[in-house]
Amino acid sequence: MKQTLIAGVLGALIWARVGDDAGAATRTIPRPLPSHPGNIFLVGETVTVPTLPAGDGDTWRAVDYEGRTVAQGRVASGPVELGRLPVGYYEIRRAAAGATNRLSVGVLEGLHAPTPLSSPICIDVAMAWFYPKEKMGSVASLCALAGINRVRDRLSWPELEPRKAEFAATNRYDWSAQAQSAAGLQVLQVDHLSPAWANPDGKRFPLDLRDSYNFFRDMARRWQGEVVAFEPWNEADIPMFGGHTGSEMASLQKVAYLGLKAGNPKVIACLNVFALHNAATLHDLHENEAWPYFDTFNLHHYEAFNAYPRLYADFRAVSAGKPLWVTECSVPVKWHGDERLQEPTDEDLLVQSERLAITYAQAIHEGAQAVYYFILPHFVEGQTQFGVLRPDLTPRPAFVALAAAGRLLADAKPLGQVKDGNKSIHAILFRASPDGQRADVLVAWSETETALDLPKPPKACFDHLGRARKVTGKVLKLNRAPLFAVLERGTRLPLVPPPEPAKLELGKPSSIVMQAVMPEASTVLEKSAYKATAGQTTTIPIFLYNFGAKPARGRLSTPMSFNSTKPLVSPPWEAELPSVVEVAPGERKELALRLTGVSTNGVEAAAIRITGEFGVAGRAVLSLNLVPIVN
């Protein structure tokens, strides 16, 4: 309970800082744009589409999520009026089948209160990359209507700083920040490339981390009041984005944090986010004591729902008690048929919308304070379709499900998982603010058709699309599609409490940062380690940076530990590094870490922990993993 309280206070401090910096305290209830981009309407509005989809025949019909006809008429030129429709997903069809003969429409319940600043319902939009300037306002409006609190964008360092210290004029990254912040959305930005002048291998971190410091300082200044949070790198732990070790990720994190805070002390400096659930990389980052240098611990996952408890437990263990942000997650579906459309089957569209609600519910239950579903725009990788919108901004059913989660799980905090003898039932209770009213909200589904008894009838019940559902008495009829049951606050249910947050680790950032620079070819990525050749002296370049305003003098120590298959009488390897060092303000000082006596005789791996005590400048830590190899 104590750790839960501390985590809640940390989260509240972050939200308060966001509101103060971005003017989010003035967030209002959004209204649709007059043009109704994406054919998204609110209940009570007359649904009108500008034109019918292409197709044969002289009639059309509109059907709901279940395929039931709700309107029909004869083909004519000009706008087509469907009348006032209840919450739901609809398609206008010109023929019995064929995605090219369909046009989708979404009807949402309008928000009854502004979306809370602490609501966990967020989404990855990547607006700067996916939408031209003229569509950005429309996309931001759709996010706001869906009750989204925070959005994730993308930036390109090479575009923003094509030459060192020469920044681009106003461009798509500024436009996207302006459009989203103007809609009341809290913007998170992320980078994943170095410009060629900082590293010829663009997928790797800059060689000189002062370049990262300067870039993030200037971006935090440039977008103050518009971009409230930054991830310094995307998925640095996989080869696509550089294949970095946990140690390298920690060094970048420390420098980026210092730069961001120098540019805007109120900005949220997120951890450069993990792609993989790899224990070695997680441990490596943690050993480098990076926790004073991130405000939130960020991760991604695309694993099956039954893997969530173990996955979150492992990340939570190295989170240092910081708020968990999941900035990409989903259990996606495949597309089939016409490769120009890349559209899932009708059945998979239903599955996508059902999984979206479950993704939010389970991630929040595991302790995530911000959950960014991946992804709003139409986006495919291979045969996988991730997007909840189509290229023309019209919705897939999952967008309507997104709006239901945004409204009904607004400000959701987990209370626990319902204990029930039926193992097919999944039911998670939250304290939330559905429609602006504090209540307990139960999200429940089942792998088989069954029923769940409640202590008393719910105040209201909605399906995963946000459509009102009648409940007879105290019984919820469940199937694979989640239900949202709104209960009175304090409703007593038999609960398994949510996982406790990790213990909050204490520490202060140091202005001194250390970095090892090794070629990518020397990395053993699955072990988050570098290769050390047996029988040879291995030299590792170590760089010390001073981001303070005064010279720093400190003492370095290099204790080693070994993972061995047999007892070691004496340390088989030796590490040599100058014991005393001075670093001027702004300096990047190179030292040589020399390893001698490297052998494979019983040693499977070694760790070197360089600790620098720099007095008022603070304590610097660099931990490196090594594996011996034989040429």
Where are these regions (language model features)?
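Carbohydrate-binding surface patches
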Residues: 36, 64-65, 419-457, 552
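Short acidic, flexible loop segments centered on an aromatic residue
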Residues: 61-63, 454-458, 549-570
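N-terminal substrate-binding region of glycoside hydrolase catalytic domains
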Residues: 79, 108-214, 218, 231
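Short, surface-exposed loop/turn segments at beta-strand-coil junctions that are enriched for proline
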Residues: 82-85, 596-602
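Terminal connector regions
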Residues: 98-101, 495-513, 598-631
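Active-site cleft segment of glycoside hydrolase catalytic domains centered on the general acid/base Glu
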Residues: 163-164, 171, 198-294, 301-317, ...
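Aromatic/acidic polysaccharide-binding cleft in carbohydrate-active enzymes
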Residues: 340-403, 417-423
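C-terminal beta-strand-rich structural cap/linker in extracellular carbohydrate-active enzymes
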Residues: 472-515
